[in-house]
Amino acid sequence: MSTQEITTTHSNIIVSHESIIHPTLKGRSKPVVGKQLRAPRDPPVSLEKKINFYIWVLTIMLIQAWQDLKTRRWFKPLQRDDVAGHYFYVPIGRLNPRILLSAPHDRVLIRTIPSSMTRDYEELDDFSACPEREIVNAGSNNYGGFSRSEHNSASLIETTLRLLPFNPPPTELSSRVNEELAAYMGSKTCATTTSGFSANLLAFQTAAQTAEKLGRHCIFLLDAESHASMFTGAFINKRATTHRFKHNDITDLEYKLRVLKAKEPDAHVCVAIEGIYRQVDSTVLMITQGNKQLISGGRGSFEWWQARGYDCPLQEIDIMTGTLSKSVGCIGGFVSANGLYAAELERQRTLQHQNGAETLSTVVLVRILSLINKPKFIQERMTTLERKASFVADCLAQAGCDILSSYGSPVVCFPVGTIQQASRFHEEAMERGFAVACGVPPATPLWSCRVRVCIFATTSWKDILDLINMIIKVSCKLQIKGITSTIFTPDILPKQYPDDPSIAEQSVKSDASLCSYVESLSKTYPGGDLEAKPPLNLPQSREAVEASVKAFSKYGLGPSSVRWFYGTFDVFIALERRLAKLYPSLEHHSGRCRAMLGTDAHTMMLSLLSACTNPYTSGVVNILFIPTTATLAVHDGANLNRPRAETQIIYYEKMDNLVAKLRKLSTAASKLHLTLYLQTTSHDGSILDLSATVQMIISEMTDPNQLKGLKLILDDSGGLGKVGPRHLGYLDLMEREHGVSFLKKLLGKKLAPKTEVVVTGSFFNAFGQQGGYIISSASFVEVHTAAMSEKVLEILSRGSS
């Protein structure tokens, strides 16, 4: 890269996820918010507030313990930290749940769960008695408001759903999206992914493989508060070394670079950041723009700074990632690359396709094309978004709010104190008809939790004003330090201008052209409305198409967030409940079951294996057995965490090898917990003999008391949709052949109480639909939900300086 700095002043410009440094610019009349290059100051907390906080924590934990005792639902921890999750984090997350009944637009229809049933609402069979209402959405990441269909774009999406296959998409369409998105981003090549998380995995893999081909040692240097997916992407590349530098500290970054270059001059150093830092000589620059793509200027942080007179050309970025859910309003992500990384990214993209990796759905790809071909529309949205976000920041700053985010950022972030304060703020906002997001430990300091207010370009000015006044009123009620009672009236709202008719004209013309393109593709790639898509016949296929059109009309293409604090779609809960009751044999063995959905099966499998490799309980050695034929996600997940003495990972080629290794272990450790990853179907179509596998393992245990626990992970990616009388997978087949009690019978009375059975799989492999799932006991799914939180994943995977 060029040694020229991207700044035209002597100021260092640092852009990250939530805390952006913005120097004063000539001619600016507005005050600059978040301008100090410093870590956020934690508000002072009195001894009385600390005591009240700990009393509140203890109360929540005791209530949860009483609930467990009353219902006789005994909690089984997956790992050591799960106790805090079960007795505290999960209960406070359930205090104010909301279920989304519509797309996550600026206004959203929700179903509110009464406080009398919030702790058990996931067990309710019928939500119809819970009241519905519309609220202002300031909690989702749909900043550009692109979840709403502009002009005639809804017709384009419906045509795509009817005429083209849902997934996998036509090859020609995928190629066109990669080419046009690369051109839009000013890069040489591009690859789409099923999530922003998987985009960062691909980006780091591309950088590491490039370094390996150059014969150089790859070193990743990350901001200490980078997104969890960045740390995960770095750590799964075991031949690379990962280091951190202080958050938003350019001086520490330059110091670390000098030290690394002095120690290893030939190293391939990759600086990976969220936003923009000053370029440094001979250093690779990787940018992740989860919250900036199609938000800041339309092409992320770089274009945002370019508009302010700074020299930061997109072409000088080596690798960039983006998240579509926070920009286009669709699930997915992308990676773009320049220079020598372009060829490696193209190679990785080809390998993923050859290995049958999940792909974005056809409608998402069409939506990407639709938006990036509307430059006037995007520019108008970006201008509107910045005006509204700046207005909110100005008003809150005037009222004394300590804004931590940058001026003009669509995420307005400020500290509110303890977790109790954050929870109360969330509750008070909901009561007043507003949804906001909260940041709590471990993502924030204990005494400085955050409220994150998300601004949409499509939020009306009236709702913007009401949102500001609500924040101030609630802050005063909660006695948040520094905020004074202030009421802003409509007369301060900025002047509004009529829409430019050329924007709609360009939009309609672009979508009409794309609609013709979709119709031409359907002649070669007919969709479910035109021919049957196995395992469905033609009438069923057409029924599925009509259901998808109705789903788009109700929910849009955009995703929702995790249930706790943010809210999730009612249809997601319905699917989870259907999955939880899918296998009577699993319920017969585990009791009450739950299911969990994932954006993509690869990331879900990675997180599942990562969680299962952590210490089980004190004094027990956790042994994980993995066949060498397991997928890359399984291997990466098992090796993600730092090595521990209490955990061992053993790979085997055949079951005989596993038995031999287990025989050695049984004499070396006094207490064992075994985790077996098993594929229910092999590549040749043969079915797993679970009974023989379990009996073979048990026969090698000289002392039955030595085995403290057994976890069976049944990967049904090759079974769901293919085997069983209902095509519901491995357990469906076993239930027909052996009855619903077969799990208990094969495990026996002594082993069954010690055994956790986890069923996981891929909707993509089964039905061509994006996503993965986990089905197990209610306690396992609960703790795994907590274990999958982004910050926890990053903490678990720490192993480098």
Regions found by a protein language model. Give the residues of each.
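PLP-dependent enzyme catalytic core of the Aspartate aminotransferase-like
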Residues: 2-7, 148-150, 179, 183, ...
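Conserved N-terminal alpha-helix of the aminotransferase class I/II PLP-enzyme fold
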Residues: 104, 113, 154-195, 545-598
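Short, glycine/polar-rich helix-capping loops at beta-to-alpha or helix-loop-helix junctions
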Residues: 224-233, 447, 628-643
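Active-site C-terminal subdomain of aminotransferase-like
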Residues: 297-407, 414, 420-421, 711, ...
